[in-house]
Amino acid sequence: MNRLPSSASALACSAHALNLIEKRTLDHEEMKALNREVIEYFKEHVNPGFLEYRKSVTAGGDYGAVEWQAGSLNTLVDTQGQEFIDCLGGFGIFNVGHRNPVVVSAVQNQLAKQPLHSQELLDPLRAMLAKTLAALTPGKLKYSFFCNSGTESVEAALKLAKAYQSPRGKFTFIATSGAFHGKSLGALSATAKSTFRKPFMPLLPGFRHVPFGNIEAMRTALNECKKTGDDVAAVILEPIQGEGGVILPPPGYLTAVRKLCDEFGALMILDEVQTGMGRTGKMFACEHENVQPDILCLAKALGGGVMPIGATIATEEVFSVLFDNPFLHTTTFGGNPLTCAAALATINVLLEQNLPAQAEQKGDMLLDGFRQLAREYPDLVQEARGKGMLMAIEFVDNEIGYNFASEMFRQRVLVAGTLNNAKTIRIEPPLTLTIEQCELVIKAARKALAAMRVSVEEA
């Protein structure tokens, strides 16, 4: 028998949640009750699969620690009052830290004025953010489309490329093996993991994948497409593959791809959703090779870990296909005043505190420590790699990676794997992580590996 809707039940549940939001602290019994509720509601109303996914942070059979609040810029606190150094960074959203006061203040001040735009009148912050990004991004990137997430920014990039290249008879897209560009239908067509793709086949036609970092494979694909009349509209890739396992291409790869795009008349789309906003030691990872894309995708850290926002920035030549009809691609909430306030404040913090340079310095320190551990534990660790504050430790098998995440959780350091490479644990902390916290992370990793070796020897 179908369950009947209950206004009384919905009202009670929402009132209970609002009461929790208003409380600054919870006592021990309230914390325990909240844990039970959250686990039950995830199981019954969100997705029980998420509980199994969080098995590396299982505590006392509770499936996962329940997050309660930020502890400081670089830590978070669970409902048990335990504080964790954040080396996951919400998959790359906390570049300026948790609840950065500059970002929070900007959003609060805008909230006091007007949280969402009317849609009909011109909204000032969208204009100011677009101008700021035009100044900040490399090359001739000039016009911005704002949305709510990384996958939406990729969708916009693909549609822009299609609209620009269709009159030229170019319809094919080339992406790379191991790529992750999102899970909406268009972005998923560029993503390269079968687990995510197969349930939704057939995906959009016209997408080909070549090995990442192999410039000859890219040239061959462009040549073959030209020979068969399947001319390439755009090449889409990440400067560093994040979900693929933090895979760095050979030096000069992006430069060579840019030259091939120019040679074959293809647009270059760079997905910097994870590598952008200072993460790799430059504001944008493409700046390490002074490469200028035709379209740039941003999201994650753009909202300062406070608001969700994505952006697709393109050259005037490409973006002009939307000039005659700006309603060809729009979104209700994209570029709203609250998200734009957060993004403007985030950029201000990144620049004023020179966080990209800090990411390079502290990233080198962390990576040196992880590489030393790889030399000390070759039976467990295959490799440590990365750039700036985007790093990965790859283990010899999947289970060891899971065990490492669990041991780090016991050491009160939060890490997690990557979506496309189960052997790899990602290290992606806030760029505001202190030197002392960097040292604590390395120390925790050493303790975790030592405990794992003992477990292996005793097995």
UniProtKB/Swiss-Prot annotation:
Keyword Transferase appears in the UniProt entry: yes
Binding-site residues, pyridoxal 5'-phosphate: G150, T151, Q274, T332
Pathway: Amine and polyamine degradation; putrescine degradation; 4-aminobutanal from putrescine (transaminase route): step 1/1
Keyword list, A-Z: Aminotransferase, Pyridoxal phosphate, Transferase
Class of this enzyme: transferase
InterPro entries the record matches: Aminotrans_3, Aminotrans_3_PPA_site, Class-III_PLP-dep_AT, Putrescine_aminotransferase, PyrdxlP-dep_Trfase, PyrdxlP-dep_Trfase_major, PyrdxlP-dep_Trfase_small
A molecular function (GO) term: pyridoxal phosphate binding
SS bonds (residue pairs): none
EC number per UniProt: 2.6.1.82, 2.6.1.29
Reactions it catalyzes: an alkane-alpha,omega-diamine + 2-oxoglutarate = an omega-aminoaldehyde + L-glutamate; putrescine + 2-oxoglutarate = 1-pyrroline + L-glutamate + H2O; cadaverine + 2-oxoglutarate = 5-aminopentanal + L-glutamate
Cofactor(s) required, per the database record: pyridoxal 5'-phosphate
Domain of life: Bacteria
PTM sites of type N6-(pyridoxal phosphate)lysine: K300
Annotated SUPFAM superfamilies: PLP-dependent transferases (SSF53383)
Gene3D superfamilies: Aspartate Aminotransferase, domain 1, Type I PLP-dependent aspartate aminotransferase-like (Major domain)
UniProt record, GO biological process: L-lysine catabolic process; putrescine catabolic process
Pfam families listed in its UniProt record: Aminotran_3 (PF00202)
NCBIfam families documented for this protein: PRK11522.1, putres_am_tran
Function: Catalyzes the aminotransferase reaction from putrescine to 2-oxoglutarate, leading to glutamate and 4-aminobutanal, which spontaneously cyclizes to form 1-pyrroline. This is the first step in one of two pathways for putrescine degradation, where putrescine is converted into 4-aminobutanoate (gamma-aminobutyrate or GABA) via 4-aminobutanal. Also functions as a cadaverine transaminase in a a L-lysine degradation pathway to succinate that proceeds via cadaverine, glutarate and L-2-hydroxyglutarate.
Family in the record: Belongs to the class-III pyridoxal-phosphate-dependent aminotransferase family. Putrescine aminotransferase subfamily.
Protein name in UniProt: Putrescine aminotransferase
Gene: patA
